[in-house]
């Protein structure tokens, strides 16, 4: 399970060091793709494959489904962390997410998200009130 918030730096070659606690789960390979809210999503390869198959099973006659599948597949990049736990983020992914040197990696239960640190701070500020008001509705049984 992927949980927590981490602040690795992006180096000049576009490499990002994954949090040590997630490396074993991602050692078999991972997929980086566009995520929600201009973040990047990082899935274990098997999890991504299962989600992609499910998305592809949706009727291809639906224009929205076709667009989603095309964007998902076109933006996916298979990676295998190097010996130091680093992955190289493509220029297209870095641009999409607006990544600077300062990044934030957050656990989202079954995948990771990579954010630019300033964008993550702004997102948290924007959504804090909504999180507080929805807490009881969505987490009532959890709390």
Swiss-Prot record:
Instruction: Name the domain of life this protein comes from.
Output: Bacteria
- One GO MF term attached to the UniProt entry: DNA-binding transcription factor activity
Where does the SpoVT-AbrB domain lie? 5-47, 76-119
GO annotation, biological process: negative regulation of DNA-templated transcription initiation
Q: Which UniProt keywords apply?
A: Cytoplasm, DNA-binding, Repeat, Transcription, Transcription regulation
What Pfam family is a match for this entry?
MraZ
Which Gene Ontology cellular-component terms appear in the entry? cytoplasm; nucleoid
Where is this chain primarily localised?
A: cytoplasm
Q: Where is the signal peptide?
A: none
Subcellular compartments:
Cytoplasm, Nucleoid
The protein's assembly and partners: Forms oligomers.
Give the family from UniProt: Belongs to the MraZ family.
NCBIfam families for the chain = division/cell wall cluster transcriptional repressor MraZ
Matches recorded under PANTHER family: TRANSCRIPTIONAL REGULATOR MRAZ
Query: By what name is this protein known?
Result: Transcriptional regulator MraZ
Q: What is the lineage of its organism?
A: Bacteria, Bacillati, Actinomycetota, Actinomycetes, Mycobacteriales
